[in-house]
Amino acid sequence: MEGRKVAFAAAALAGIAAAYGFRRWHPSRIEVEGSSMRPTLEPGDWAIAFRARRLHRGDVVVVEHPDRVGFELVKRVTHLPGDVAPDGLGLADRVWVEGDDPEGSSDSRSFGPLPMGLVRGRVWFVWWPPGRIRALGPR
C-alpha cells in the first residue's frame, strides 16, 4: 500500500511538472514548407519550437509575417535589439531575420525589422524525417 502512495505521488508530481513546462515553454510543432532555410531546414522537415525568453544571433526562430496575420515563417536571427540593422536603422525592440538561402526568401530584407511580439519561438530540434533528426543551435 505504501509503495502505491509513493508511485501515485511521483506520477502526480511528474504530471504537474509536465503541465508547468508545457505552459511555460509552450512547445509547438512546425512543418517546413519552403526552401528559404536550406540547407539547415528542408521542405518536409518537422521541428519543435519553444517560446524563447532570450534570443541570440544565429537562432532559428518562428515569426509571424508582419503583413499576413497568422502566417508563420521560419528564419534565422541576424540582428538583435540594440544592433544597427542592414538598412542603417537602429533596432529598439525589433529583430532582423533572414532565410539561410536568400533566393526567394521573404524576410527582413523585404519587410524590414520585426517587433519582438511577432517572434513565436525558437526552433530547438528537427524530429522528422528520421535521417535528419538533430538539435539546432545558433550558427
PLM features: what roles do these ranges have?
Residues 1-139:
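Extended hydrophobic leader/signal-anchor segments used for secretion and membrane insertion
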